[in-house]
Amino acid sequence: MAAIEAVNAREILDSRGNPTVEVEVLLEDGTFTRAAVPSGASTGAFEAYELRDGDAGRYLGKGVQKAVAAVVDEIGPAIQDLDAADQRIIDATMIELDGTENKSRLGANALLGVSLAVAKAAADSAELPLYRYLGGPNAHTLPVPMLNVINGGSHADTNVDIQEFMLLPVGASTFSEGLRWGVETYHALKSLLKKKGLSTGLGDEGGFAPNLDSNRAALDLLMEAIDAAGFTAGKQIALGLDVASSEFYSDGAYTFEGQKVDAAHLTAYFADLVASYPLITIEDPLDEDDWAGYDHFTAELGSKVQIVGDDLFVTNPKRLADGITRGVANSILVKVNQIGTLTETLDAVSLAQRSGYTTVLSHRSGETEDTTIADLAVAVEAGQIKTGAPARSERVAKYNQLLRIEQDLGAAAVYAGRSAFPRFQA
């Protein structure tokens, strides 16, 4: 393999018009790659630290020049001449250089940009696609796309509390077919919204953001759209939710649909939804620190539905290990910028899979054209990917990359489909 010759960084814009970090890596053999870092809107309290400048006179305080300087002035010199193939050594070097528990000195956005760019460079130098370089010869499973077609919560300015309402084409035979089903249902949903006089404006992740009377009304719209597109709900296309409950939790209570309620109330509410709709996955149904609530929620619904920990686990192996020991949730959402390096991300995925937890690769609401997570989903055989609606180029870029990977794999490609959701019975 080739040693790292130079590392550069710059400030670019994400899909919400906020600055983010882009890193470029040059190897001694001439290989040149770049990676861009995403940013979230609903962020977990235990995520690795995203370093921003705090200068109110520039980008409203959201500039990332400090993180860029950290890459150029500190990280680059520290990893120069290291072998790009030594990902674990490079990531460990950056973590030690930062010296904090949450990567707050140099910024997780600085570390991640370098970590991903190095992995891409190593793959290119080895003349391998990234998914093959990271996953080896057995990486061949295409994930089920979890298409976020109705946006609420912190992703849209509406009365809908739940952040994401998703379509999951579990009955398709290939990824490309599943994506087509999702796209056709997305367009059917747009037509329905127009007929009903509802907004077809888009939220951060490309989904529609209509102002509805209730969260259940959004599920009803999805059921109607699936039927209008010519598909069978449950058998061909299932439903999923990202509740993002930490966004409406305060002082020991949840403000949900205009009422102050507790975890037991929400558990009963979602149990009713699971019984009423082909709902197969629920993400962050409770606050990230409501462990007792998760104990009850998992006991009640863990055998019936996928319970995904996002803010709960924040892609952190230590948080995940605590959850596994306690037996809460049964799936982890994997966001590379929550932990800040590729190797720590891979460690979290490995721990989850060894412990019988499913894994979901995920974008952030503030995205770029970077497609790393598409390759990563195939590399780790995640079986599921969340990267928004089939709209807005920063979302579609990931789906298009998965289409390329499917074609590259040829006859070896397998679509995860229903097998990605072992608890789902239809």
From Swiss-Prot:
Keyword Cell division: no
Ligand binding ((2R)-2-phosphoglycerate): 163, 335, 364-365, 386
Active-site residues (renumbered): 205, 335
Cofactor binding description: Binds a second Mg(2+) ion via substrate during catalysis.
Enzyme class label: lyase
Molecular function terms, GO-annotated: magnesium ion binding; phosphopyruvate hydratase activity
EC assignment: 4.2.1.11
Reaction catalysed by this enzyme: (2R)-2-phosphoglycerate = phosphoenolpyruvate + H2O
Binding, Mg(2+): 242, 283, 310
Recorded GO CC terms: cell surface; extracellular region; phosphopyruvate hydratase complex
Transmembrane regions listed in the UniProt entry: none
Obligatory cofactor(s): Mg(2+)
Keywords, sorted A to Z: Cytoplasm, Glycolysis, Lyase, Magnesium, Metal-binding, Secreted
Localisation: Cytoplasm; Secreted; Cell surface
An individual GO BP term: glycolytic process
Recorded superkingdom: Bacteria
Pathway: Carbohydrate degradation; glycolysis; pyruvate from D-glyceraldehyde 3-phosphate: step 4/5
InterPro entries recorded: Enolase (IPR000941), Enolase-like_C_sf (IPR036849), Enolase-like_N (IPR029017), Enolase_C (IPR020810), Enolase_CS (IPR020809), Enolase_N (IPR020811)
PANTHER family linked: ENOLASE (PTHR11902:SF1)
Function: Catalyzes the reversible conversion of 2-phosphoglycerate (2-PG) into phosphoenolpyruvate (PEP). It is essential for the degradation of carbohydrates via glycolysis.
Cited HAMAP family: Enolase (MF_00318)
Annotated family: Belongs to the enolase family.
Name this polypeptide is given: Enolase
Protein species of origin: Clavibacter sepedonicus
Taxonomic placement: Bacteria, Bacillati, Actinomycetota, Actinomycetes, Micrococcales
